[in-house]
Design a protein with these regions (language model features):
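Vicinal oxygen chelate
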Residues: 1-2, 68, 77-126
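N-terminal beta-strand motif that seeds the catalytic metal site of vicinal oxygen chelate
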Residues: 1-20, 63-66, 124-126
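A short, glycine- and basic residue-enriched loop/turn
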Residues: 10, 37-39, 110
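Amphipathic alpha-helical segments
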Residues: 17-30
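Short Gly/charged-rich anion-binding patches and loops
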Residues: 18-19, 37, 75
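Short amphipathic alpha-helices within nucleic acid-binding modules
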Residues: 22, 74-79
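Conserved short beta-strand elements that form part of the metal-binding/catalytic scaffold
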Residues: 30-64, 70-71, 88, 106, ...
Length: 126
């Protein structure tokens, strides 16, 4: 019988080792390696989880695959940049952002960044 209660999302990467290092060491998430499966599980502080899997000929997602809600986007961007993460990834014609990559108009304050596979992630102020 189908039960949607435990649903979670997933996305592909081209290098599981690089993804493991980035999500565990750079972002500080708890990352579980699913033995022999070629899958990682990202454990989020909210109790949620995300499946990450290796895919040959991976093409980065052209949309945001994972959003991290934060109380203060400015502080989150400072923290990410101190960890070596680039937050200015879009041309202003696509999404008008300031020099630090924060979009300040048309919705919540948000800054996008990429994982080592090129997938788009974001911090957004709630």
């Amino acid at each position: 019988m189908f039960h949607p209660d435990g649903a979670y999302s997933g996305f592909a990467v081209d290098d599981l080792d690089a993804a493991h290092r980035f999500y565990a060491k750079t972002l500080g998430l708890r990352v579980e390696v699913l033995d022999g499966s070629g899958f990682l599980t990202l454990h989020l502080g909210s109790g949620g989880r995300v499946l990450v899997y290796g895919k040959p000929h991976h093409q980065p997602a052209s949309f945001t695959v994972l959003n991290f809600p934060v109380a203060d986007v400015e502080a989150a961007v400072d923290d990410l940049r101190e960890r070596g993460v680039e937050t200015k990834i879009y041309d202003d014609a696509d999404f008008p952002t300031d020099s630090r990559g924060i979009m300040r108009e048309g919705g919540p304050l948000i800054a996008w960044f990429r994982d080592p596979a090129g997938n788009v992630l974001a911090v957004l102020e709630e």
